[in-house]
Amino acid sequence: MAEEYKNNVPEHETPTVATEESPATTTEVTDRGLFDFLGKKEEEVKPQETTTLESEFDHKAQISEPELAAEHEEVKENKITLLEELQEKTEEDEENKPSVIEKLHRSNSSSSSSSDEEGEEKKEKKKKIVEGEEDKKGLVEKIKEKLPGHHDKTAEDDVPVSTTIPVPVSESVVEHDHPEEEKKGLVEKIKEKLPGHHDEKAEDSPAVTSTPLVVTEHPVEPTTELPVEHPEEKKGILEKIKEKLPGYHAKTTEEEVKKEKESDD
């Protein structure tokens, strides 16, 4: 600053310093005349110009330095604020992470609970469907029971079936005092008429013995009177009935032939 002040001082205020100059130098200065005057002015102008330029540069530097410093400080502050914001964001993200995990857990739990509820609803629907089908079956059975003829069919299915075959009874059959034998004979006839019964009887049981037929030489004349009960005639009628049954005639003919031979002897 002192140098600048010295440079800025005008020429008329500069102190004069007494110097001992030789007479030769004074004569040279006076001899040159105008040329010396111009040369001195040029020399004097140059340091003033440099001083003004330096002062302007220093002034600009002084003005620009605080501006740059302020800008630099603002940049630093901005950087600090940005860093703080980033740190806050990271902290918020870290704080939000467990909340996201909790949300996932909640969603999983809600989905599992919803799936459980759906499973229970499906089970209830299945139960209702089964119950409805059972109710329908019960109603159908009740309706069938109310229908005519349904009860008889169920009874027939439960009770074993017994078939009865009508036996042709001749008009000449006479009542006798042995009803048990007649019953046995009728049962045997019915069994013989059943399919497959005759073969089993032939294999398991021995040859059936039947009463011989009584052959009369003189035919009996028809009379209007009631016939007298004779056990031989009764047996003959039963044998005739047996002969009419299928599967019985062959055995009776063979036995009759044998009996005729024995009677001839």
Curated annotation (Swiss-Prot):
Please identify the protein, giving its name as recorded.
Answer: Dehydrin COR47
Instruction: List the gene name.
Output: COR47
Q: Where is this region: 3 X 21 AA repeats, Lys-rich?
A: 133-251
Biased segments, Basic and acidic residues type: 1-14, 29-47, 69-79, 96-105, 129-156, 173-204, 227-265
**Disordered, as annotated region:** 1-265
GO cellular-component terms in the record? cytosol; nucleus
Which residue positions does N-acetylalanine occur at? 2
**What inducers act on this gene?**
By cold shock, abscisic acid (ABA) and drought stress.
What residue spans carry the Low complexity bias annotation? 160-172
Phosphothreonine occurs at which residues? 90
Keyword annotations from UniProtKB, A to Z = Acetylation, Phosphoprotein, Repeat, Stress response
Task: Cite the GO molecular-function annotations of the record.
Answer: copper ion binding; nickel cation binding
